[in-house]
Structures are given as structure tokens and as C-alpha cells.
Amino acid sequence: MTDSELMQLSEQVGQALKARGATVTTAESCTGGWVAKVITDIAGSSAWFERGFVTYSNEAKAQMIGVREETLAQHGAVSEPVVVEMAIGALKAARADYAVSISGIAGPDGGSEEKPVGTVWFAFATARGEGITRRECFSGDRDAVRRQATAYALQTLWQQFLQNT
């Protein structure tokens, strides 16, 4: 997805959030704030985005958004239980209506047989108690994996929570 397409998708998400009077927050690890960056590239985004969290280390995940150390130790940072706790923690900390969390292995190192480079976990949560998780395995270099993860996060937020609702 090109920068222009990411911008268009972000604008679409922003318009839907603004129409609902809703806000979104992000908790990002492997994307390093890229989702928040794309959101804030849109003029007027302060109407639907107040804050995001870049929680790259396990310590940051625990300190900033309340991911339990036991969860990190048992499952590892790139796991469904961790992204769920990231999304719920960000939702509470930001007092937002929607949260998107992302944790993955962008590469080129860090992969394993169980979690190869390109593995990314996502969680999406709402203040109404709804939520979904997704696991994707993207291909390409580090930049490509991170770009695909950013696009996937925005697309899924749009398709699962904002489109036709």
C-alpha cells in the first residue's frame, strides 16, 4: 500500500470516527507508532485521536498500558494474550472508544519456527466490550512488514467496526 493509499484509508477511518463522535487509540510495538503517524497525518485528527502508545519493550508494555509480566513471560510479546492486554490497557489509559494494538516480528532477525519473521498479532477492542484478534504473516523486508501491518490495522478497524455501522 502506497503512502497515498494509507492516507486515504486513514482519512476514511477518521471521517467515520468523527461522524460517531468517537475516538481511537493505538498501542504499537513493531510498527513503532506508524499507525498513529498515519492517523495524525490527517488535518483535524485531534477530533478522533488524542494519544497513542509506542510500547516497544516488554517493560514499556507493562508500565504504560498494564500488560501483566506473567502474560509476557508465559506467552512472549508476540502473542494473542499480549495484544489483547495491550488493547484493553490502551483503551482504559486513553479513555477511547476504540483501540488497536500490534505486536510482531518485523525482522530481519528475531524469528523462530513458531513465530517466523513477518508474524504480527493484532487486537481490536471497543469501550462497549467488543473485541477481535488476528494473526497475520507478512512477507518482505522490515519496512514492508511494518507497512503491511499498519495498513492491515487500519483496514481491519474500518471493516470490522466502522463500515456500515
Swiss-Prot record:
GO terms for molecular function: nicotinamide-nucleotide amidase activity. Keywords: Hydrolase, Pyridine nucleotide biosynthesis. Optimum pH active over a broad range of pH values. It catalyses: beta-nicotinamide D-ribonucleotide + H2O = nicotinate beta-D-ribonucleotide + NH4(+). SUPFAM superfamilies: CinA-like. GO terms for biological process: pyridine nucleotide biosynthetic process. The keyword Transcription regulation does not apply. Its EC number is 3.5.1.42. The keyword Hydrolase applies. Has nicotinamidemononucleotide (NMN) aminohydrolase activity, not active on other substrates. Belongs to the CinA family. PncC subfamily. Homodimer. This is Nicotinamide-nucleotide amidohydrolase PncC. The gene is pncC.
